[in-house]
């Protein structure tokens, strides 16, 4: 194809807003600022916020954002069996993965990769993202970023709670539905 898919463009725009929020104009931005993680909200992915970012800043973010999304797509293919963007049922999960994988150290850390795989499937199979998707997006992004800051010592409460809810939602995906009973 000679043009980007609408799914890719939307994810790219969301990630550009997140990068702008964390960078505050600093090209060497970090996703490890606990206060910024805590104050993150869905407004940074909305049109009004994105239209206020100067074009020269966006130009500086695009390569980094594309790299994060490409890493996330590779992760989804290699670790989760997702072959095409159309197979992602909740596209903002791709943005969460893309955000995490902006950090090269996290992308190369096997513990972070294992954690992200557990988070991905737990979020899907627990029904975490089935309603109030924007709130679920921010809640998951904040908790994932917080839990991987120090992956070896993190208690991973959020992800453990998701794991405990896997296949328990009678209206979404309980054992009987999955086993087609």
Please report, for each region that a protein language model flagged, where it lies by residue.
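Polyanionic (Asp/Glu-rich) segments that form extended negatively charged tracts
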Residues: 1-102, 106
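Charged substrate- and nucleic-acid-binding regions of tRNA-handling and nucleotidyl-transfer enzymes
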Residues: 1, 90-96, 107-146
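Surface-exposed polar/charged interaction patches
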Residues: 18, 22-25, 75, 79, ...
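Short linear sequence motifs
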Residues: 14, 42, 113-114, 165
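Generic intrinsically disordered, low-complexity segments enriched for polar/acidic and small residues
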Residues: 5, 18-19, 26, 46, ...
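Intrinsically disordered, low-complexity N-proximal targeting/linker segments that flank membranes
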Residues: 125-181
């Amino acid at each position: 194809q000679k043009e980007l898919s609408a799914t890719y463009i939307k994810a790219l725009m969301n990630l550009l807003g997140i990068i702008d929020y964390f960078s505050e104009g600093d090209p060497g931005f970090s996703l490890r600022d606990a206060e910024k993680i805590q104050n993150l909200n869905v407004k940074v992915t909305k049109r009004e916020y994105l239209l206020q970012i100067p074009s020269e800043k966006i130009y500086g973010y695009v390569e980094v954002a594309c790299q994060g999304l490409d890493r996330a797509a590779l992760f989804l293919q290699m670790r989760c069996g997702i072959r095409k963007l159309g197979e992602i049922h909740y596209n903002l999960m791709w943005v969460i993965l893309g955000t995490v994988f902006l950090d090269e150290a996290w992308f190369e850390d096997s513990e972070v990769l294992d954690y992200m795989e557990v988070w991905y499937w737990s979020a899907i199979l627990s029904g975490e993202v089935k309603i109030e998707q924007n709130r679920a997006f921010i809640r998951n992004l904040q908790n994932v970023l917080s839990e991987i800051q120090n992956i070896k010592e993190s208690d991973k409460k959020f992800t453990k709670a998701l794991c405990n809810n896997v296949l328990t939602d009678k209206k979404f995906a309980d054992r009987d539905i999955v086993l087609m009973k």
